[in-house]
Amino acid sequence: MKKMLKALGILLLVVVLAAAGLILWLSVTEFKPAPVENVEVSAVGALDQVDPEEELQILSWNIGYAGLGAGSDFFMDGGKDVRSADREQVLAYLAGIKSSIQTLDPDVVMLQEVDLDSGRTYRINEAAYLALDASAHAMNYACDFVPFPLPPLGRIYSGVFTTTQGLAIDEAERISLPCPFQWPVRTANIKRCLLASYLPIEGSDKYLVAVNLHLEAYDSGEGKIAQTRMLKEFIEGEYAKGNYVIAGGDFNQIFPGGLETYPNTHPEIWIPGLLEEDMLAEGWRFAYDLSVPSCRLLNQPYDPADTENTQYYVIDGFILSPNVELLSVEGVDLDFADSDHNPVLTSVKLK
């Protein structure tokens, strides 16, 4: 009996020391970005400035790191899988995503959950695969080993990615957003950010500022509120400089009217925040489409016939500054074939 207790004690000590060592290592190697960082812009050849007289098409799409297509579920959404796509499936999803972008033919593409070097996507550089003419990537998840759940997520290097077709990006910045998580959970968690890309405008010293965002998903709600407040302060500051601002991405908050269109029948799994029209300053506006859901719950593989368990949301869209005219906005129904989100395409013109 004493030998058994001694063995259990030694085993417990080993487990405690291993856990302490892991937490120490994660703390030392934690991704700690500065409040504002310059982001490298890669470009191919001579590119154009934005023509203020021409219509501009902008696409926002959370691509789910090309690992969350129609056949996927996810443990954080009430599903079972941690990694539901093998390498061939990731490549197939990526090919489908690229094909859809080429078909939609936007001028500016703002993507979320784009992996650079992650175990879950077999170290494929998705940004390089999807890049058009000028591109910038801002990291929001950088961890050599994410120890949860079981099996663990492992290595993740991922973020938001903006790429343009034929248009120049003069510079880009990563703006850190408040992190709602405390130590030690924070050490292996997402560090949300804005990616602001500055596109020059013909005949002007002002910029079109394309702000790519992916706000908090799995917090108590306070994180989303703080991040939305900071987003609002940033875009209003850019507008005050005379710039034109389009903020787009995955807000993880339901756009006005979205809850009535797609009631949340699974609040025990996930309750997204709510965006209110009156949160915007005078002249600013949302651009979103309620006719097509922009996201599905990953509690199971996609089955639109299962109306009881299939949950939809409209949490992806845009915010436009008063000097940007909204011409149209369309949720593009791709049946969640290659991602758990559908893309949203807006057409605008500078005033």
List the model feature ranges, each with a label.
Residues 145-148, 175-182, 215-217, 332-337:
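Short, solvent-exposed aromatic-acidic interface loops
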Residues 3-133, 141-152, 351:
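N-terminal, active-site-proximal structural segment of metallo-dependent hydrolase catalytic domains
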Residues 122, 137-162, 187, 222, ...:
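Active site of divalent-metal-dependent phosphoester/diester hydrolases
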Residues 80-87, 114-116, 177-186, 213-222:
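Surface-exposed cleft-lining segments at the edges of enzyme active sites
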Residues 57-63, 93-123, 197, 207-213, ...:
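Active-site beta-strand/loop signature of hydrolases that rely on acidic residues for catalysis
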Residues 87-94, 224, 228, 308:
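A conditional alpha-helix N-cap/helix-loop micro-motif detector
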Residues 47-58, 67-70, 156, 163-170, ...:
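Beta-strand-turn-beta hairpins that frame and shape the catalytic cleft
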Residues 61-64, 112-114, 142-145, 164-166, ...:
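Active-site-proximal beta-strand/loop segments in catalytic clefts of secreted hydrolases
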